[in-house]
Amino acid sequence: MVRATNAVASHRRKKRLFKLAKGFVGDRKNHLRLTSGAVMRAMAYNYAHRKQKKRDFRSLWIMRLNAAARINGISYSKFIYGLKKAQCELDRKVLADMAIRDPGSFAAIVGFAKEALA
């Protein structure tokens, strides 16, 4: 009796794995055993860095806000505290974008925060 290998499913599985390994260099792109480990590791890094990206962007926004706030004569922490006291609902992403694209409006918001602190 002939041995059944289920060739269609195994070929599809390998094809899916090699498709995920597109762009890999050396044997990692076309040897099944090496490709499998490389793809698993890549997916693990992908998962971790999707979480890391959120932290990275928040720290970038804070750096930009700190620089822009200091140009307007106030520290970042006092600026955020003033906005909280003034019940301003703008988040750091919007504020950082405003600081870069529209410095005049950002200066007005800094003045708003300074008034709340006084």
Curated annotation (Swiss-Prot):
It holds the Pfam family Ribosomal_L20. One of its GO terms (cellular component) is ribonucleoprotein complex. Gene3D superfamilies: 6.10.160.10, Ribosomal protein L20. One of its GO terms (biological process) is ribosomal large subunit assembly. GO terms for molecular function: rRNA binding; structural constituent of ribosome. Keywords: Ribonucleoprotein, Ribosomal protein, RNA-binding, rRNA-binding. InterPro entries: Ribosomal_bL20, RIBOSOMAL_L20_CS, Ribosomal_protein_bL20_C. Belongs to the bacterial ribosomal protein bL20 family. Binds directly to 23S ribosomal RNA and is necessary for the in vitro assembly process of the 50S ribosomal subunit. It is not involved in the protein synthesizing functions of that subunit. This is Large ribosomal subunit protein bL20. It comes from Protochlamydia amoebophila (strain UWE25). The gene is rplT.
